[in-house]
A protein has these predicted regions:
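A well-structured
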Residues: 1-178
Length: 178
C-alpha cells in the first residue's frame, strides 16, 4: 500500500521554489501603505466625471491616471492573492485579499462613468481630440475597442450600480475558494 505524502509547510520549501513576493512589496506594511494610496485615487478618478468629452488633453490626462491606478492595482492584487495562496488557512492574508477587493470595487465604482462618457464622444470630436492632443494616440487602440461595444454599454448610473456589486459577485469564490 502506498504511503500518503504530507504536503510540506511553506518554511520547508526551498527558497528557489517559492514566489519572490518581496520583489513586489518588501513587507506587508509597505503593501498596506500602497493600498491606502490606491484607495485615495478614487478622488482623482472621480474628479474627471462629466469632463471626458471636454478636450483631448482631459481625456488623455484621465487615461494616464486610469492606467497608473490599474497598474498599481495589479501589483497590489498579485501580492495579496499570492500571499493568500501560500496558505489558505492564514487569516491575515485572506483578510488582506478581502481588503484589496473592497478597494478594487470602490475604484471600479469611482470610474464607472468613463465608458458611457467615452461612448458619448462623437467620432468627429474624437478625431479632433487625436489631432489636438497627439499623446492621446497612445490610447487609440483601447478607445477604439471600447467604443466597438457601444451597443452593449449601460448608462452611467447603471454602470455604477453594476461596478458597486463587484464585491458581492466575488462571494462564491470567497466562500468556496475556487
Amino acid at each position: 500500500m502506498e504511503e500518503i505524502k504530507k504536503i510540506p509547510s511553506r518554511d520547508q520549501i526551498p527558497a528557489e521554489d517559492k514566489w519572490a513576493i518581496e520583489d513586489l512589496y518588501p513587507t506587508d506594511e509597505a503593501w498596506e501603505a500602497e493600498l491606502a494610496a490606491l484607495a485615495e485615487s478614487q478622488k482623482t478618478l472621480a474628479s474627471f466625471a462629466g469632463r471626458l468629452g471636454e478636450s483631448g488633453e482631459t481625456l488623455y490626462a484621465y487615461m494616464e491616471v486610469f492606467e497608473q491606478v490599474n497598474a498599481k492595482g495589479d501589483l497590489l492584487g498579485s501580492y495579496c492573492m499570492r500571499r493568500a495562496d501560500e496558505d489558505t488557512r492564514n487569516a491575515t492574508y485572506q483578510a488582506m485579499a478581502g481588503k484589496f477587493m473592497g478597494v478594487a470595487v470602490a475604484l471600479n465604482a469611482a470610474c464607472s462613468f468613463d465608458t458611457p462618457e467615452i461612448m458619448a464622444i462623437s467620432d468627429e470630436k474624437l478625431a479632433q481630440f487625436y489631432a489636438e492632443c497627439p499623446k492621446l494616440e497612445r490610447y487609440r487602440r483601447y478607445l477604439t475597442n471600447l467604443r466597438r461595444r457601444k451597443a452593449h454599454t449601460l448608462s452611467a448610473a447603471e454602470e455604477k450600480l453594476l461596478a458597486s456589486a463587484g464585491e458581492m459577485s466575488q462571494a462564491p469564490d470567497t466562500i468556496y475558494g475556487s
